[in-house]
């Protein structure tokens, strides 16, 4: 049987899906997860929800979501089911966006192609994301970061429709509410884009409603007592230090970590170039590879810069990798757009894509094999540690061995300091009285 490029792209996508679900299978609770488990054991849902909003953060939609899901944490396969739900929602939201674009620009790709490339985009987004262990797999963070991106994509799919019905407005409103109450960076960047969009033609009513709802939601977040309390705990950087921190964060994201994130994302997204070469529609006739590549890079740089500025200004320190997922989403969309358009305007180039795709498939096979072993060993070490803690009846500190490498998962590792919040959360979540300490080698 003759192997087609579509077959290789399909295998590439399947290997990604296998990786995501196997990794989810080996996922374990970590850090703040144990705090939520303990609090929900000692307080009612609404007591703890009120406490979070008034004393810790104003992320009102995120707080509701995390408490809702963590009510099911006692079930054995809860984390696997949660991660699986996240991936399915992400897949469906991307599919809706691609389907809307397919209809809007009349590219006439069949549903199988749209479904396949929704998986390919997940791969681009995944590899573009810094520290996926926190923003994708760690439930305490993914509900704020990955899920806000999912809601953004659902809203975008409704926005892209040529005619907007009541249901589309409802979807957009719900999405804006969730984003504003969970991911401040994504909310502010969306508001900025909406502001710019008012200078162009379009549905003014839709723009106004979206802007008002997003502003309202983030206001409930920002002006909360909990957010004010948390802001008082973080330092205010002098202007020079702020510039240096933002500059370093931007350079690190774009250049220093290029080989770990952007390069793998581009390689995995190569099928979008191939898809462009097969398109029967000539989109963007003024496309110029140098100019449009420059515009794409400038867009990515600006998004990363704004993302870094918002987080660093608020925290008074370097931005946590999980907080850059907004940059990863917008950059993934920009890179995929460029590759597709480049493919459309490169139809005269006669290239055999199969060797390149075969290399990607082989790399994904190796990738799956390596990280299967890493994640399996990590999960076993966490399970063994949990057994040691729960079976210890001695009234003395419990000294634990170091966990194995967590790979793409968020590590549940603690410290040698029994008073560290990681140690205290683990102790509280498991309901033990003894101090828990990481044994120093």
Model-based region annotation:
Residues 6-20, 116-123, 171-174, 210-216, ...:
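Alpha-helical transmembrane segments
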Residues 158-177, 205-209:
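Short hydrophobic alpha-helices at membrane interfaces in multi-pass membrane enzymes
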Residues 90-101, 149-160, 191-199, 271, ...:
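Transmembrane alpha-helical segments
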Residues 290-297, 342-367:
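Signature aromatic-anchored transmembrane alpha helix within multi-pass, membrane-resident enzymes
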Residues 4-57, 70-116, 353-441:
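Intrinsically disordered, polar/acidic, low-complexity terminal segments
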């Amino acid at each position: 049987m003759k192997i087609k490029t579509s077959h290789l792209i399909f295998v590439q996508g399947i290997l990604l899906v296998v990786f995501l679900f196997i990794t989810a299978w080996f996922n374990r609770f970590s850090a703040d997860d144990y705090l939520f488990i303990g609090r929900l054991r000692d307080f009612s849902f609404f007591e703890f929800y009120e406490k979070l909003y008034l004393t810790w953060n104003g992320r009102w939609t995120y707080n509701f979501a995390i408490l809702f899901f963590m009510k099911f944490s006692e079930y054995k396969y809860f984390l696997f089911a949660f991660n699986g739900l996240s991936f399915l929602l992400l897949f469906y939201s991307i599919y809706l966006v691609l389907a809307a674009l397919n209809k809007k620009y009349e590219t006439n790709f069949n549903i199988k192609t749209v479904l396949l490339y929704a998986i390919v985009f997940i791969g681009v987004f995944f590899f573009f994301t810094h520290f996926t262990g926190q923003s994708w797999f760690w439930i305490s963070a993914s509900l704020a970061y990955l899920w806000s991106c999912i809601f953004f994509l659902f809203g975008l799919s409704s926005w892209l429709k040529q005619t907007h019905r009541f249901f589309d407005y409802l979807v957009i409103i719900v999405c804006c509410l969730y984003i504003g109450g969970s991911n401040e960076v994504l909310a502010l960047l969306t508001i900025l884009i909406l502001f710019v969009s008012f200078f162009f033609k379009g549905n003014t009513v839709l723009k106004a409603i979206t802007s008002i709802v997003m502003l309202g939601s983030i206001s409930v977040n920002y002006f909360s007592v909990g957010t004010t309390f948390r802001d008082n705990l973080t330092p205010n950087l002098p202007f020079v230090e702020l510039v240096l921190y933002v500059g370093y964060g931007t350079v690190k994201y774009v250049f220093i970590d290029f080989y770990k994130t952007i390069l793998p994302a581009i390689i995995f997204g190569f099928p979008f170039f191939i898809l462009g070469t097969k398109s029967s529609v000539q989109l963007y006739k003024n496309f110029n590879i140098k100019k449009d590549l420059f515009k794409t890079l400038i867009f990515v740089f600006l998004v990363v810069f704004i993302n870094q500025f918002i987080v660093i200004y608020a925290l008074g320190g370097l931005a946590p990798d999980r907080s850059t997922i907004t940059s990863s989403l917008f950059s993934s969309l920009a890179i995929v757009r460029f590759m597709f358009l480049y493919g459309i305007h490169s139809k005269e180039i006669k290239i055999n894509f199969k060797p390149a795709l075969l290399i990607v498939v082989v790399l994904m096979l190796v990738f799956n094999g390596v990280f299967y072993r890493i994640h399996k060993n990590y999960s076993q070490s966490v399970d063994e540690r949990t057994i040691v803690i729960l079976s210890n009846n001695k009234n003395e500190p419990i000294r634990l061995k170091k966990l194995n490498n967590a790979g793409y998962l968020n590590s549940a590792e603690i410290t040698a300091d029994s008073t560290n919040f990681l140690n205290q959360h683990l102790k509280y979540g498991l309901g033990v009285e003894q101090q828990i300490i990481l044994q120093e080698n």
